[in-house]
From Swiss-Prot:
Subunit structure: Heterodimer with IL12A; disulfide-linked. The heterodimer is known as interleukin IL-12. Heterodimer with IL23A; disulfide-linked. The heterodimer is known as interleukin IL-23. Also secreted as a monomer. Interacts with NBR1; this interaction promotes IL-12 secretion.
First-listed, main subcellular location of the protein, grouped into a coarse class: secreted
Name of the protein: Interleukin-12 subunit beta
GO molecular function terms noted in the UniProt entry: cytokine activity; cytokine receptor activity; growth factor activity; identical protein binding; interleukin-12 alpha subunit binding; interleukin-12 receptor binding; interleukin-23 receptor binding; protein heterodimerization activity
Location in or out of the cell: Secreted
Domain Fibronectin type-III: 233-324
Keyword check for Glycoprotein: yes
Annotated source species: Sus scrofa
Segment forming the signal sequence: 1-22
Amino acid sequence: MHLQQLVVSWFSLVWLASPIVAIWELEKNVYVVELDWYPNAPGEMVVLTCNTPEEDGITWTSDQSSEVLGTGKTLTIHVKEFGDAGQYTCRKGGAVLSQSLLLLHKKEDGIWSTDILKDQKEPKNKSFLKCEAKNYSGRFTCWWLTAISTDLKFSVKSSRGSTDPRGVTCGTATLSEDLGEYKKYRVECQEGSACPAAEESLPIEVVLEAVHKLKYENYTSSFFIRDIIKPDPPKNLQLNPLKNSRHVEISWEYPDTWSTPHSYFSLMFGVQVQGKNKREKKDKLFTDQISAKVTCHKDANIRVQARDRYYSSSWSEWASVSCN
């Protein structure tokens, strides 16, 4: 998120008296105040201006206080903590004239706060936002974890190399799984002009904006589609016993979601026999074909997974079939 400085002589809801104040518009009627967060920090002075041509009879209130905070067309607020944030309303004669919601974005020791999401610590520390693609179509899924269950709002924006914010469209974030201590949210994104066979020169940028009560945070991830590829598992696993042999031929098909043509977008497959005791596993066999010969014991399973043949993508989840 690029820091913006709202410097305007008249704004329908908020007018900032100082051009150096760290405040910017998140959406209509909602503003983020950026604060250095340490004991005795000076805070920020914010001047609100009521959207009315009149000068007299105006009162100001906040959802944080039952008292009248001031009178007149403008209200100066010293924002130092969350008790100073919230929704401010100007009225005249009981009628609401305008409202502004102030959120806080904390910076401690030069680092923006990351309190809302869980650090998944894979593949490295500070991995809050994770993304995967099933193919090279430009469609990908991102997800994140949070221990917070109420008063949450997420918004996701994406672009290719931050040059065209309209180039990648992301849907609405949804709760996809309740993991007990944590909630898993996900969002689907699609690059509008993706060319599966083209070499990527600029990474995709993803920005997740998170609001919990009066706290604002943002999280970013940057990647090439080729680096987040994880195919779906192979499908239609079949066993064909071989005569006079303990071996069987196992065959499978490419997942429906994988890019075509398969002659160009080829997969590598890993095949493994798993004994009745799931800890008992044979060495994995690798092949770029859609069949393999393996030894199949009673009560064992044969499982197959896939990854991009030419680029070291993540392996798919396993697909399995019983030897019985």
